[in-house]
């Protein structure tokens, strides 16, 4: 067990990588410990670190494909085994590593018959293809396949609106998340007032960076977020008579949403982000992919709207309703309003 292998220091806070492996080119795993921590500190650090790992680290993706010979996304091309949609989905799965800023152009230009893989992508020097064996398409006849690509570096999700492009450009939904998953667990030891904790942090990445690199980048991002609070020369603002404070009243969404908007109290809901709630990761990710980031965004949707979200289930809607009732005494209408 890790407890037997780790020598816990009672004075200096230390971290250590206790397990690291590469399951394949697109799946890395790392397990880390941080100790000794006072009671409650491990959970505080673990929650913040997990959110930073999943939401604050930048990744590189293919965000657009262009070919003037393609009539629409769901068409089939003679001599190519896959449909255009399947090719776009394969391009979405390509794992890239880069230090670029903004967007860069890349391309694929091959002649069949042959298998087209990520190795056939002609990319800028600043972009590295992690797994060159990733499949893109199968050309069954002696035809030319030329596709222009757009590569971006960003964070989170970038959901494209599906449409038939007139200039042959086809946006690709991008998931700029090099960390596939992150978990934390806590081991307590000691008795009474001497009780301390060890934080275990597990990280899975897509191979574009190692779990150790992800841990370092997430830590830097958290530090950058807290640095403004350390500025000693900031003015002290004193609020008198509750000026500029907005209370969250108990109300029913159906009856008083219009009144809340007239009074401009929706600003309070704009300041409450959905990652502050108790939503499970799958539900949270579905909402983020639909550009629902704040409580106000959520309240602008009905239960019917939520059920239209891809991979959303009735159980997810019930869980959201329970959280809204528990913390805000708010309801969502069943149908559009």
UniProtKB/Swiss-Prot annotation:
Q: Which reaction does it catalyse?
A: RNA(n) + a ribonucleoside 5'-triphosphate = RNA(n+1) + diphosphate
- Any one cellular-component term (Gene Ontology): chloroplast
Q: GO: which molecular function terms?
A: DNA binding; DNA-directed RNA polymerase activity; protein dimerization activity
* CDD domains reported for this sequence: RNAP_alpha_NTD
The record, for SMART domains, names: RPOLD
Enzyme Commission number(s) from the entry: 2.7.7.6
> Which branch of life, at top level?
Eukaryota
Q: Which Pfam families match?
A: RNA_pol_A_bac (PF01000), RNA_pol_A_CTD (PF03118), RNA_pol_L (PF01193)
Protein's GO biological process: DNA-templated transcription
Q: Which UniProt keywords apply?
A: Chloroplast, DNA-directed RNA polymerase, Nucleotidyltransferase, Plastid, Transcription, Transferase
The protein's location, in the record's own words, is: Plastid, Chloroplast
Major place of residence: plastid
**Which family does the record assign?**
Belongs to the RNA polymerase alpha chain family.
What does the comment on domains in this protein's record state? The N-terminal domain is essential for RNAP assembly and basal transcription, whereas the C-terminal domain is involved in interaction with transcriptional regulators and with upstream promoter elements.
Summarizing the function annotation, the protein's role is: DNA-dependent RNA polymerase catalyzes the transcription of DNA into RNA using the four ribonucleoside triphosphates as substrates.
What is the annotated quaternary arrangement, including any partners?
Answer: In plastids the minimal PEP RNA polymerase catalytic core is composed of four subunits: alpha, beta, beta', and beta''. When a (nuclear-encoded) sigma factor is associated with the core the holoenzyme is formed, which can initiate transcription.
Protein name from the UniProt record: DNA-directed RNA polymerase subunit alpha
């Amino acid at each position: 067990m890790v407890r037997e292998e780790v020598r816990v220091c009672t004075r200096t806070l230390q971290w250590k990588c206790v397990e690291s492996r590469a399951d394949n080119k697109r799946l890395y795993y790392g397990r880390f410990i941080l100790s000794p921590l006072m009671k409650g500190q491990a959970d505080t650090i673990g929650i913040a670190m997990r959110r930073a790992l999943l939401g604050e680290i930048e990744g590189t993706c293919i965000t657009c494909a262009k070919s003037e010979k393609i009539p629409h996304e769901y068409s089939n091309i003679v001599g190519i085994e896959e449909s255009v949609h399947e090719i776009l989905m394969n391009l979405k799965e390509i794992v890239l590593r880069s230090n670029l800023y903004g967007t860069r152009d890349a391309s694929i230009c091959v002649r069949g018959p042959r298998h087209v893989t990520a190795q056939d992508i002609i990319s800028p020097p600043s972009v590295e293809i992690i797994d060159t064996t990733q499949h893109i398409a199968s050309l069954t006849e002696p035809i030319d396949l030329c596709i222009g690509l757009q590569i971006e570096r960003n964070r989170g999700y970038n959901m494209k609106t599906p449409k038939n492009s007139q200039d042959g450009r086809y946006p690709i939904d991008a998931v700029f998340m090099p960390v596939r998953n992150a978990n934390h667990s806590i081991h307590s030891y000691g008795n009474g007032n001497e009780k301390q904790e060890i934080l275990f942090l597990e990280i899975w990445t897509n191979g574009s960076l190692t779990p150790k690199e992800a841990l370092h980048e997430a830590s830097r991002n958290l530090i950058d977020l807290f640095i403004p609070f350390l500025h000693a020369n900031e003015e002290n603002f004193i609020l008198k008579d509750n000026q500029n404070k907005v209370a969250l009243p108990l109300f029913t969404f159906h009856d008083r949403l219009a009144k809340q908007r007239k009074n401009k109290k929706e600003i309070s809901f704009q300041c409450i982000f959905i990652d502050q709630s108790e939503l499970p990761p799958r539900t949270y990710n579905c909402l983020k992919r639909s550009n629902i980031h704040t409580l106000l965004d959520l309240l602008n949707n009905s239960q019917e709207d939520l059920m239209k979200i891809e991979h959303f289930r009735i159980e997810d809607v019930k869980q959201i309703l329970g959280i809204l009732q528990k913390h805000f005494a708010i309801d969502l209408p069943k149908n559009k309003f």
